[in-house]
UniProtKB/Swiss-Prot annotation:
Coiled coil: none annotated. NCBIfam families: PRK05422.1 (NF003843), smpB (TIGR00086). It holds the Pfam family SmpB. It comes from the Bacteria. The keyword Lipid biosynthesis does not apply. The lineage of its organism: Bacteria, Pseudomonadati, Pseudomonadota, Betaproteobacteria, Burkholderiales. The gene is smpB. Required for rescue of stalled ribosomes mediated by trans-translation. Binds to transfer-messenger RNA (tmRNA), required for stable association of tmRNA with ribosomes. tmRNA and SmpB together mimic tRNA shape, replacing the anticodon stem-loop with SmpB. tmRNA is encoded by the ssrA gene; the 2 termini fold to resemble tRNA(Ala) and it encodes a 'tag peptide', a short internal open reading frame. During trans-translation Ala-aminoacylated tmRNA acts like a tRNA, entering the A-site of stalled ribosomes, displacing the stalled mRNA. This is SsrA-binding protein. One of its GO terms (cellular component) is cytosol. Its main location: cytoplasm. It comes from Leptothrix cholodnii (strain ATCC 51168 / LMG 8142 / SP-6). One of its GO terms (biological process) is trans-translation.
Amino acid sequence: MSIAENKKAFFNYHIEERFEAGIVLAGWEIKSIRSGQIQLTDGYVVIKDGELFLIGLRINALRSASTHVNPEPDRTKKLLMHKAEIRRLIGKVEQKGHTLVPLNLHYKGGRVKVDVALAKGKAEHDKRHTIKDRDWQREQGRLMRHKVSAPHKD
């Protein structure tokens, strides 16, 4: 079950490869995620000292959050992956134009996981082409719907 989607990532990037990673969260963050207080659209992944960190994931604290902890909505979260996967990602990210973007957050076995994609940025003309294709698909659906619902003349 998906918690949050990053629809902007599919528009701004060509997704080349997907990976699943665990995420280190505090208790109040889990409670906020379960209530839907999460925003993923501006998130991105950086590599520091051989570890992955998710930046820009916004988790708004609930009013009933702990009183002894000062909730920080834009806190940097550490991602958990196997060292071999991280090394492979480091090699690919160092290539020109590649980056890591979060695609979605979901539950797996009661834990929150994040899908991270190895992606390459789209040029402006690619984005326009994506919009044109999406509009054409929508128009095709409309045409087919009207064609099917039109009465036949014998």
